[in-house]
Structures are given as C-alpha cells and as structure tokens.
Amino acid sequence: KNLNFTDTSAADGTRNGLPSYVTNGQQTFFRYGSAVIADGKRVRIAPQAYYYNGPFGLITEYARVSQDVSKSADGSPAAGGTAVNESIVAGTNKKLKHDAWQIAASYLITGEEASFKGVKPKNDFDLDKGGWGAWELVARYSEINLDKDSFKRANGQYGTDAGASLTAANAGTFAYADLTKSAKSAKTWTAGVNWYLNANAKIALNYEYTTFDGGAITKGSPIATNVNTTGSNVRDRDDEQALLARFQVAF
C-alpha cells in the first residue's frame, strides 16, 4: 500500500530554437511557425502521484510548460534562419502555456506486488523450470492541450501565414504555431500488456488510439483567417492508431 506525491520543476532562459511535439507513433502534431523563436524563460512543472495496493497500481501525472516566444524577421535557426536572431519584431512577445496530463492503471494477473520501483516475478521465465514470469495488464488515458494563443496573431485575432517573410509591417498576419501542421489538442487511449521475464527484463506491447482537434488543412484550400475556429477550412488530423512493442533491460 504505497501513496506518494512528487513534484519536479525547472526553469531556464533561452533564445534558441523551439521544440515540436510528436506522438508515440513519431508523427509531428504541433510545431511553432518558422518566424517564431524562444525569447525569455521556459518553465516546466510536472507533479506526479501514484498508488499501489497488492497487484493493482495507479499513477497520474500533470505537466505544464510555459514558454516565452517572439517573432523574428530573420526567422528561426531551426527553420533555416540566421544563426543569431537580432530582428525581434516589437510587440510580438508572448507567454504560451501548454498543459498535459495522464492517468494509468495496471494489474498483475499473476499476483505479484505492484511497485513504482518495478515488478519482481514470483517465478522468473525459465522453460526448464516451468516459470513464465509476471504478466501485467495496463490501460492509460492521456491528453495535451496547446495554448489557444498559439493559433492567434499578435493582435489577438486568428491569423494566416500570409507573406513570404515576416517583417514589422506584416507581423500581425502570422500566428505563433505552424497552422499547416499544428493541432489544438491530442487525446490518446492506450491498452497493453507487460511481460516481466525477470526483475531486469520486460517486454511491453501497447495499442494506442489518438484523436486530434485541428491540425490539418482541407485539401486544395488556403488557410482561413478564422483558422482552428468553427466554420474554418481547417479540419481535424486523421486519427492515429499505433501498435508499439518494446524490450527493456534494467541494471
């Protein structure tokens, strides 16, 4: 019977490139626009709680990333801009806050004690001795919600990526997210099974189903000024289904 709460946080000042977000199937579903750069602090918090009782386990986690960004007429280094960004467009600095959370449950059908530190099978996998290790069923729900201001222009209106390059004159026409690739949110349902061969080796097999809100443009249509809002020509990305297998060895 274990109940524990942990909290980790980190903060750093940066003016480099910005990360993209990908699914477990390695598909990018959110990235910043080519003219957007990190300009200030990035703060991450990730509190976590877990509970174990006999073969049953439950873990939940929340994460928030707060990122200061601006727009540069030189573009982003990661998107082919100059190595040092000097032409920051006035009035485009914004703090974006992205949130994610998950809850996962597990049950050891072979009767072992569940633990945050790992599972020790009653009988290690050994065909000669008739041992089959430990078997665990798992289920998880997770979602991420991107800051709605990511999809707005500097003046607060939903905008387009009009124009070949960003300048002080046309800065208001650029959103902070790459509107051709970025979804407003993603939700994933996962079901799987873990096979613990022994205390140090595990084989995991998971099926994941992910849905998206936004993130795809209707074929043949330009980006609308009311992008990612009701009535726009931006549709949801296709659902993603993934079957993932992993072999893990711990020492």
Question: What are the roles of these predicted feature ranges?
Answer:
Residues 1:
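Internal, glycine-rich beta/alpha segment that forms the wall or movable "lid"
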Residues 4-251:
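Outer-membrane beta-barrel pore domains
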